[in-house]
Amino acid sequence: MAALQSAPDSPATQLEPAEDGSECDADPEEEEEEEQQEEEDEEEEEEVVVEEVATPVQEVAEVEVEANSADNGGGDDDDDGGGGDDDVEEVLAEEQTLSLGTQERHSNGGHAKAPVLQGKALQTSRVSPTTQDEDVEEEEEEEDEEHFLTQGLVTFEDVAVYFSLEEWERLGVDQRDLYREVMQENYGILVSLGYPIPKPDLIFHLEQGEEPWVEDGPHPEEGDVVTGVYTGAWFWNDDIEDHEEEDDEDFLAEVAEEENEPPGLWSAAYGVGDVPGTWGPDDSDSVQTPEGWGPNPGSLGILAEEVEAKHFLSGREPGENFLVPWAFPAVAVPIGCPETTCDVCGKVFPHRSRLAKHQRYHAAVKPFGCDECGKGFVYRSHLAIHQRTHTGEKPFPCPDCGKRFVYKSHLVTHRRIHTGERPYRCVFCGAGFGRRSYLVTHQRTHTGERPYPCLHCGRSFSQSSALARHQAVHTADRPHCCPDCGQAFRLRADFQRHRRSGGCTEPSSGDGARMAPHEVGMAPNEVEMAVAAVATVEPEELEAAPAETEEPEAGVADGDTEAEARQDEQVVVAPAAEATVPDSKKDPEPDRRFREMGNGLAEGEGPSSHPFGFHFPMHPKSWLHPDGFPILGFPEFSERLQADGRHLPGPLGSPLSLQGMGLACDPFRSVGPGAGVDGGLRAFPPAVRSLLSEPAPAALAEEESPWICSDCGKTFGRRAALAKHQRYHAGERPHRCADCGKSFVYGSHLARHRRTHTGERPFPCPECGARFARGSHLAAHVRGHTGEKPFVCGVCGAGFSRRAHLTAHGRAHTGERPYACAECGRRFGQSAALTRHQWAHAEEKPHRCPDCGKGFGHSSDFKRHRRTHTGEKPFRCADCGRGFAQRSNLAKHRRGHTGERPFPCPECGKRFSQRSVLVTHQRTHTGERPYLCSNCGRRFSQSSHLLTHMKTHRGPGSAPAHTSSTKAQAPAKATPPLPPPGSGSGTLLEFAGGTSFGSDPAAFAGPSGSYEESIL
């Protein structure tokens, strides 16, 4: 317990000086009594408060003294720390009881009899207040109830205990496990009681299996980022899912770094998000500071969770300061240094000058404005950082590849691509990631979480970017327009990529045919058909004067319901024959896109405030007729028209008249070079319009526009994937290994390659514990345990656990030998066989046998050869104990015990355990007899039969017979005389493949002349 008692920042130590009331935080009731009561009543009330606070502290001290005395007098058995677990558990329980009871007492308006979360120590030792004190408290309870409710929120910090590194190292393994268990249990209790507490960093790191110690050191200065504290520390807002806001987040991080301010404060001050005065989900991170140096830890997080996406200024005047004191109801202003405490957010500063500078954020004073965009900033340094976005300055270069970045955080993240560093590990599969946000997104594949639902169709997605791409199916809006070439983009990321590429082309002026989609920056197989639900147009109305219009209700999407569709039919619009296309292509506000339609509409009005449309993937050749307007040409919709009984006035692709058509004009998305009606107008028949008001088919909603590689024809769902793929064809390999210099196309390939240098094998087998560097290798290995062979040969039915093995096996049927030797031209079916063969041509054979002098180019071949001299047989059968020199021979032998017969005869179906036995058996069907007796010319199908037959030519006392055997297709060779029987020199057998001597019946020379060992 020395570690707990000696901790300088432990809760018990911090509460000890409160016994005399000298440093105890004054009860909030004292502030009210200074204005309402006399000085005597104030002193009396203060004594009661001090007495109530000091009594629990005395109990904690008494409990610790009793625990220490029990430890000292408990006998020799406790000297070795055997009772450390009980001490840690007791102190943690007391701390939890004290903190929870005190907080609950405050949350009940200061009532002395609040029963919830009261510990036994508080119940037995509480000094009962006098009747007069109870009356005073009851009178002020209603008055201060709201104030206490806001300041009495229980946070995890109130029941948490922290250790320094030195103290943590003193704890035993059991004590550390007990600490982890108690901390997680405390958090679970708070959550079960309904407190809106976000998960603290301490619990997160405990779940990750990391050490929870707190780094020693002096208190940081105001605003410093405390990187050594796992809980209660500021952290960078770099885990935002929406990467479109990444620039804003990095700017805030850079500002915080240069101004020595916590980034979370900048997020709150600037209101990261598109809606000013709204606390968005990006601000709900755990905004915490060390005690005494900012808001109550976790309080801002609680606030964000309670009022997430709710306006602070409901009913307020526009432009009024939204960061007012009532906007932070959960922040308690520290007592004791009010002259340096912010009365808005409760942050404490060491000097008044720092407080005055900080209050600029709340007062919205931004004296430094940007000349380019007019954006204001509190500090000049912030303006300098912001101006990099206009000047293009990138002061942070990568030392490896030279690429430059605007923000230092971008450089740090980019550097991980070169180093292969992946500091964030998945607890489920061990996969590593370079960003925490990537880890969070990846873990959703394990948990199945899909937090981003589509408001149109209800489909959910695990990533916000996937939702954004999906929503393009439901809307035709392209709010990001290029001022140079006029191309419009749905996503800001696509627009920024277009601007960086510098591929803008000015549209040519003059009349001309409408451009194809691929000529205006659209996907080659994507056609955008935007329809605004307006009234039909009669021919005589085309030349009529503009008429007054009735605009549909703003804010309602057209075509959502049948009633709205009927309402749209009643809208009267008299468009002119020509629509004026503005000179400036700059995209105005989304709700004022149709103001220059040229059809008599008033300024700011339009056919609809929410145009709808869909994207239909189709071949570019059928997307438009050269003499008419683009109309629906997707075959699937043609079938739908026929099924629904709706007919177009003409065949698909034919010229279309404006009579009876609905018109829609968006001049800021006009793609044709000519002016007039074609400059942004789209015409569709009513039948098509009613179809488009219905939800898109699931197949169309799911389908992505493929991007085709012009080199190999491979298709991709995204342009970024195609760009990465084209690196293969271009030979670009930007990711280089620092150890061996090998280059890779993808950063993930480099990270996987790095494991060959580090020896890391993050994928363990759950069956045998073997570890692998790749997940695919582990999957193939697991099939060895399960016996699964999903890759089956279509010719012979043989199964394989790996696709590569099936591919190599298939070449045995086709006779393909794609690997040729450059030296001799010999071809092989496998690359490994070619590699082994090439050692025969290599002059250098570093592995030479000391017994026979034979050289080998590969160490494995040399080791296998050495076993012929040493007689070593390292592979032993677990059933019979027989040893083998090669693993393959052991595998063949094992089939005799297991009964496995993987080689079936295609003629009769009989199965065999060895391929050589199958080959011998097949001769009974083919009639082949390759073994010839040179004496009588008789043939045999097996060499053993020939050996038995040769004994008939040698009678007792007769001269040795000259015998030989050959294959039928090869002539017999002359053989020397046989040695006399019993000479021990063996029997000479001659084959087309060579000669072999053998006295052991278990050894024989096969038809190929190679030596074979009997396995069974």
Swiss-Prot record:
- Point to the regions of Low complexity compositional bias: 51-60, 570-582, 963-973
* GO biological process: one example: regulation of DNA-templated transcription
Compartments (UniProt record): Nucleus
Q: Where is this region: Disordered?
A: 1-147, 541-606, 950-1016
Q: Name one GO cellular component term.
A: nucleus
Q: Give the GO molecular function terms.
A: DNA binding; zinc ion binding
Broad class of where this protein is predominantly found: nucleus
Question: Which segments does the record annotate as C2H2-type zinc fingers?
Answer: 340-362, 368-390, 396-418, 424-446, 452-474, 480-502, 707-729, 735-757, 763-785, 791-813, 819-841, 847-869, 875-897, 903-925, 931-953
Q: Where is the composition biased (Acidic residues)?
A: 17-50, 74-93, 132-146, 541-553
Q: Where is the composition biased (Basic and acidic residues)?
A: 583-596
**Residues in domain KRAB?**
154-225
Per its UniProt record, what InterPro entries does this chain match?
KRAB (IPR001909), KRAB_dom_sf (IPR036051), Znf_C2H2_sf (IPR036236), Znf_C2H2_type (IPR013087)
Q: Where is the composition biased (Polar residues)?
A: 121-131
Keyword annotations: DNA-binding, Metal-binding, Nucleus, Repeat, Transcription, Transcription regulation, Zinc, Zinc-finger
PROSITE patterns membership: KRAB, ZINC_FINGER_C2H2_1, ZINC_FINGER_C2H2_2
Q: Which family does it belong to?
A: Belongs to the krueppel C2H2-type zinc-finger protein family.
Q: What does this protein do?
A: May be involved in transcriptional regulation.
Q: What is this protein called?
A: Zinc finger protein 316
Q: Please tell me the species this chain comes from.
A: Mus musculus
